[in-house]
Amino acid sequence: MKFTRALALGSICLSAVFAAPVSDFDANVAKGLRLIQTSEDTAPFWATEDQKLDLLRADKGFFDLTETYHQVEEQKAKGIKAIVERATYPSPSKSSTVKSIISTLSTSRMQSNLATLTSYNNRYYTSSTGSSSSTWIYNQLVSIASGKSGITVSQYSHSWAQKSIIAKFNGASTSAAAVIFGCHIDSINLSSPSSGRAPGADDNGTGTVNLIEVFRALVTAGFSPARPVEFHFYAAEEVGLLGSQAIAANYKSSGKAVYAMINLDMTGYFKPGSTEVIALVTDRVDSGLNTYLRSLISAYCSIPAGTDYQCGYACSDHASWNTQGYPAAFPFEAPTVSENPNIHSSSDTTSVNGFSWTHSLEFAKLATAAAVELGSV
């Protein structure tokens, strides 16, 4: 999601929503309304789908709480807390292994996978192509993991057509806190969400193919971590972080422990003429995990960590995990002023000036390093 414009447009949209009480939840859902929250400081409110789109067009970040509302309320009533392994993240110590696996990362494979993803008219969460593109990703992951022990690939069904996917290295200690890498697989054209052309090359084809390639490289290398290492491919990020909210809430309700969650969303662009960096988001993240990522960037990447910046409320899937109480981080393609201006339209392609495969590769390197280093402790 994009998060840089002034919020005046958002306030115009907010004035039109329904201030119905949450106590009328089931009745409002039956009317087709959605429960929306736009900041920690404001109460949730009801909005139509069209009003939700108005918020998106105004670049107003929000959670759509509708799908997880009852589950989260149950967590509060029962006093369920996120299980987090609170430990100091280790200094990088697996240099030989990390660099060996990094050397096998292939931009040509990422290019090929992205060509397939962008060939779908769009990957909107309710569209047939949104569903079929998710199935294609699932099949790629299943093929990569075929015949390998200790690895599972599963689909995560939602109330909408597009499924999320979880590919998992079970780890020697299956009950240990998991290292999670996440990306969203959906795309959107804000002019015509359900049918408009939305190649979503950078948002978020890049993060998706990064994680497919990292998963492949780890499987090929015979990666066998000490703890679970998971790769999540989330449906429906563009419309209120629906997929990641569902999975994060499920992990909390199920008592699953998390060591770190690292989100890749847009990794392929930096503004021509700007300094090439890996930007680290500072809001709704774990500061200790950010510090650790800086050490990995210094050790394993060819470009530096950039000036930290805030991306805004509910800007991407890391926020779902942070809200549930888990440590999360979000390395991003560029500082806000240098991010891709072509997203959420038919122009989000690899041909735009500023798109760079060598830049995107740096994020695959970072994810590989984090998987090996964090998965080994």
Predicted features along the sequence, with ranges:
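Acidic/histidine-rich catalytic neighborhood of metal-dependent amide-processing enzymes
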Residues: 161-164, 195-288, 317
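N-terminal hydrophobic or amphipathic helices/low-complexity stretches enriched
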Residues: 69-127
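Active-site-adjacent substrate-binding region
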Residues: 270-377
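Primarily auto-inhibitory N-terminal propeptides
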Residues: 18-86
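A non-catalytic alpha/beta surface segment that caps or lines the substrate-entry region
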Residues: 112-170
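Fungal secretory targeting signals
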Residues: 1-21
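Second-shell loop/turn segments in exported
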Residues: 96-105, 119-129, 151-155, 193-204, ...
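Solvent-exposed loop/turn segments at secondary-structure junctions
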Residues: 122-125, 158-162, 171-175, 185-189, ...
